[in-house]
UniProtKB/Swiss-Prot annotation:
Its main location: cytoplasm. The active site is at H360 (proton acceptor). Catalyzes the last two sequential reactions in the de novo biosynthetic pathway for UDP-N-acetylglucosamine (UDP-GlcNAc). The C-terminal domain catalyzes the transfer of acetyl group from acetyl coenzyme A to glucosamine-1-phosphate (GlcN-1-P) to produce N-acetylglucosamine-1-phosphate (GlcNAc-1-P), which is converted into UDP-GlcNAc by the transfer of uridine 5-monophosphate (from uridine 5-triphosphate), a reaction catalyzed by the N-terminal domain. Residues 1-226 are annotated as: Pyrophosphorylase. Pfam families: Hexapep (PF00132), NTP_transf_3 (PF12804). InterPro entries: Bifunctional_GlmU (IPR005882), GlmU-like (IPR050065), GlmU_C_LbH (IPR038009), Hexapep (IPR001451), Hexapep_transf_CS (IPR018357), MobA-like_NTP_Trfase (IPR025877), Nucleotide-diphossugar_trans (IPR029044), Trimer_LpxA-like_sf (IPR011004). UDP-N-acetyl-alpha-D-glucosamine binds at residues 9-12, 23, 73, 78-79, 100-102, 137, 151, 166, 224, 330, 348, 363, 374. SUPFAM superfamilies: Nucleotide-diphospho-sugar transferases, Trimeric LpxA-like enzymes. This is Bifunctional protein GlmU. It is found in: Cytoplasm. It catalyses: alpha-D-glucosamine 1-phosphate + acetyl-CoA = N-acetyl-alpha-D-glucosamine 1-phosphate + CoA + H(+); N-acetyl-alpha-D-glucosamine 1-phosphate + UTP + H(+) = UDP-N-acetyl-alpha-D-glucosamine + diphosphate.
Amino acid sequence: MNNIHAIILAAGKGTRMNSTKPKVLQILSNNTLLEHVLSQVKTLCNKIHIAYGFEGKQVQQKINNPSINWVKQVKQLGTGHAVAQVMPYIEGNSISLILYGDVPLIKRSTLYDLINKTQQSGIALLSVILNNPTGYGRIIRNNKQIQAIVEQKDASNMQLNINEVNTGIMAINSQLLKQYLNEIDSRNTQGELYLTDIIACAAADKKTISSIISKNKFEVLGVNDKVQLAELERLFQKDQAIQFMKQGLGLKDPTRFDCRGTLTFGQNCEIDVNTLIKGKVALGNSTTIEPNCIIKNTIIGNHVSIFPNCVIEDAVIGEGVTIGPFVHIRPQTHIQTHAKIGNFVEIKKSTIGKNTKISHLSYVGDSTIGKNVNIGAGVITCNYDGVNKHQTIIADGAFIGSDSQLIAPIKIGKNAKIGAGSTITKSVSENQLSVSRTKQKNLKYRSKK
């Protein structure tokens, strides 16, 4: 493609958001609105320019991209004024692609087509047909040729009946853009410089104005308040879920699935309702996730079964593992193949060996547990002394009886056994049985008189 400059307008405060953050930093599926736009243009353009205003330092710090040219719009005097602030940095022999930081679902493929149209005609608009066009600038045509764009507040009653509207997104030869920006004025109800007025200038100049009518109205929707943001989130999530399903992922209900990050998966994977994926998550083949689970930054192997109401964060789960229900696996945990983690178990910063079972009501923290170990119900690794965390090591084949406490730092040897109800404060050697209990007393029961 020719020399392409992206101009992203991101100066608005977003008053209706009622937020200390500027509108373009509101979050949609784990990324800011502006980051969504940038992700679609970064491979299309030679240079990206962002016109910023409200809380500009906050915006720049969040994006943190030194290759972007940041241009301050001191006064918000309209879209034409915003673009004019950027023009000193635009090369004449180029195409300017103009976008908005609060229109986050625009597709790269649409922008690619728009640029191609511009290379043929010099100007190309992106429009959309809406059943209810209220609030949008109308596309005015004469014999199918675009003549102007009229904003809602300046439109006549006849023009208000038009349902083809301007999305604001356009591509234009940069020399023409500079020329027509010098020809527009602020004689309108808003007293602003409308970027859309350059279309009337081009039509008067007998220029052919091309257009693409978006087939997907959702990709050109803007965001003005938290209600619209939530609506757009649902549209984004459903569209993403459908794409996953087309790639082979089984989703019980695509409207009740959220991926706020990236998800890769093998064949025959099934995810039930109300599952949230965050960060980078990878699923192997034939893995199932049942309802109400949260999976974050985790690698999950083949043939893993995750039962309802589990939270798994920053972990590695080996092949054939079963987890849940009601399990919390915290960061830096590695569960090796065919281990079983049962209901109401919490594991933190630990390695759980092959074929090991932790079936009920246990806490395991800062521990290394070998293979073929059985951890009974209610076992606690007491890893914190009030100041420091300490490690528990349990070797292969050990058996830890129910309701035992292991006071770290401690090591339980290979094939050792801990009797139920014990509090173990000293390490136990290989093949030893350790029991720590007070002597049982059976006292005569005295009934009340």
